[in-house]
Regions:
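Alpha-helical transmembrane segments in multi-pass membrane proteins
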Residues: 44-96, 143-148
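Transmembrane helix-loop-helix hairpins at the membrane interface
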Residues: 156-261
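Alpha-helical transmembrane segments of multipass membrane proteins
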Residues: 54-59, 82-86, 118-127, 199, ...
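Low-complexity, intrinsically disordered extramembrane tails and loops of integral membrane proteins
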Residues: 1-38
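Transmembrane helix-loop junctions in multipass membrane proteins, especially transporters and channels
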Residues: 91-96, 131, 135-140, 208-212, ...
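Membrane-associated alpha-helix detector
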Residues: 41-53, 141-145, 167, 178, ...
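Alpha-helical transmembrane segments
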Residues: 40-57, 114-119, 196-198
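Juxtamembrane helix-loop-helix connectors linking adjacent transmembrane helices
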Residues: 68-70, 97-170, 188
Length: 261
């Protein structure tokens, strides 16, 4: 993986989280053109995407509108709809990311391999820390409610739906929100490392169903996984395709054994 020579904390993010190229002090500042500023369609789609996703998932406010019985099916449908809206909202950075990958295929494969191995190590560290803290708190064997809920959902729908929605669509939607959108947003007010850490903590909190100590400690591996994806996103020049691919592989590797059982 390659990094820019400019320190991350000194890079200026654009509206979609990609760093602006360096400008010399003597260069005249020109007004943004139609190709550099977000178009109206992207802006509207971004507002819809972030608002709907935040309402139903991180904030867990969907139960005010949807009955408990319809919750799982509605959640899967929302992921599909958000994926479509997100592709519109982030179509320009996604197109640039795809072009970068296509231009350097071997480098992209190597980046995925290194990124995947690094993610395994970071997630393992998070898992060990979680287990140690759970044992210290006398909560050994506690099961994260999110994992139990996912196991129930897997039994409710055909395998193809689980693979497509929870294995591919869902991870991409989460990467769009927590990496493409959230890191870029936080970078406007704080250094890049703060943006990565905060987005990772919030990603971990997404998997909590309560503030019980067992939930807080059990979600640590998820936060570490988010940290790995955030670092990969930043180190690859804000290319979302890398963390999204790692996220998809992570989910598929977890779901496939359950589907085959």
């Amino acid at each position: 993986m390659s990094t820019s020579r400019t320190p991350l904390s000194q890079q200026t993010p654009t509206a979609f989280g990609a760093p602006n190229p360096s400008l010399s002090d003597s260069a005249p500042v020109s007004a943004p053109t139609a190709s550099t500023r977000p178009d109206r369609l992207s802006t509207v789609a971004l507002v819809i995407f972030t608002s709907v996703y935040a309402f139903f998932f991180p904030l867990h406010l969907g139960h005010f509108l949807i009955s408990e019985d319809a919750g799982p099916a509605t959640g899967l449908a929302l992921y599909i709809a958000l994926f479509a809206v997100g592709c519109v909202a982030f179509r320009h950075p996604l197109a640039r990311a795809a072009h970068q990958v296509a231009a350097r295929k071997r480098r992209a494969v190597l980046t995925l391999i290194v990124g995947g191995l690094a993610t395994l190590v970071i997630e393992l560290i998070g898992g060990l820390a979680s287990s140690a803290l759970l044992n210290l708190a006398g909560l050994s064997g506690a099961i994260l409610q999110n994992d139990a809920s996912v196991a129930e959902v897997i039994q409710m729908f055909p395998p193809i739906i689980i693979i497509v929605v929870l294995g591919i669509v869902g991870p991409i939607v989460e990467e769009m929100f927590f990496r493409q959108f959230l890191i870029g947003l936080i970078e406007r007010f704080a250094p890049t490392w703060v943006a990565v850490v905060v987005s990772s903590v919030l990603f971990g909190a997404l998997h909590m169903h309560s503030f019980a100590l067992s939930e807080v400690l059990s979600v640590i591996p998820h936060a570490f996984f988010g940290l790995s994806c955030g670092l990969l996103y930043v180190k690859t020049g804000r290319n979302l395709l890398y963390p999204a691919s790692i996220h998809c592989l992570n989910n598929l590797s977890a779901f496939l054994p359950l589907l085959l059982h």
